[in-house]
Amino acid sequence: MNKGYPVTDLVILAGGQARRMNGLNKLLQQFDGDTQLLKIHQKLKSSVSEIWVNSHRDYSIYQSIVPDIKCFQDDASGFFGPLMGMKSAWSHVKADYVLFIPCDVTYIPTQVVAKLHSALRKNKQAQAAYVSINGDALYPFCLLKRESLEVLEQQIDKQQLSLKNCFKLLHAQVAIFQKQNLFFHSINSLDELQQYKQIKAFKEIFSTN
C-alpha cells in the first residue's frame, strides 16, 4: 500500500544500561497497561516495513511478545548511547529510511512517520528529522536517511556522541507536535515511572467523576 513516503524501517533503541531503573529493561515494562514493546509495535506496525530492536539482551522475550521482531546489538561493546545504535542499524536494515524511537517514550503521535518524512522534505540537504513535543526536542525519536551514516561514523570516531550536535551537521528538520497534560514524554527512572502511573491513575479517577 502506498503510504505517501518511501519504505521505512523502525528501530527501537533499547541498548542502554538502565542504571536509574536498577537495571530493569524499560522495553519490557508496562507504562500504560501493555509492555512498551507491544505498545510501540501496535502503534507503528502499519506505518513501517520491518521492526527491529537495538538491544544487548532479552531477545527471546522480545520474540515471544512479537514473533517477527528482529534484533541487533551495537557494533562496539560498551554503552555509547543512541548515536551508536543508529550507526549500527545501517549494517542490518534494508530500507534507506529508518524511524528511531526510544524504548521509554510515553506518547507516540498519530501520523508521526508521515510527518517526519514531510519535515525531511523541507530541506534537500537534510538527512534527519526529529520529533518535538510541547517544545521539547526528542532527538532520539527521529527519522534518518541512509546517507547520514558517514556523519554518524565521523562523530563516533571523534567521540562526539551528542545527538544535538550531530543533527546540526545533518541539517536536521523538526516535526512539531502538541499534547495536553503530558507530564512525562519519556521515563528515565523508577521514580518517574511511579509518578507517571500515579498521575495516570488520578486522571482516570477524575475523569469518571
From Swiss-Prot:
GTP binds at residues 13-15, 26, 54, 74, 104. The keyword Magnesium applies. GO terms for biological process: bis(molybdopterin guanine dinucleotide)molybdenum biosynthetic process. Pfam families: NTP_transf_3 (PF12804). InterPro entries: MobA-like_NTP_Trfase (IPR025877), Molybde_CF_guanTrfase (IPR013482), Nucleotide-diphossugar_trans (IPR029044). It is found in: Cytoplasm. It catalyses: Mo-molybdopterin + GTP + H(+) = Mo-molybdopterin guanine dinucleotide + diphosphate. Its cofactor is Mg(2+). Mg(2+) binds at residue 104. Its main location: cytoplasm. One of its GO terms (cellular component) is cytoplasm. Keywords: Cytoplasm, GTP-binding, Magnesium, Metal-binding, Molybdenum cofactor biosynthesis, Nucleotide-binding, Transferase. GO terms for molecular function: GTP binding; metal ion binding; molybdenum cofactor guanylyltransferase activity. Monomer. Belongs to the MobA family. The N-terminal domain determines nucleotide recognition and specific binding, while the C-terminal domain determines the specific binding to the target protein. This is Molybdenum cofactor guanylyltransferase. It comes from Acinetobacter baumannii (strain ATCC 17978 / DSM 105126 / CIP 53.77 / LMG 1025 / NCDC KC755 / 5377).
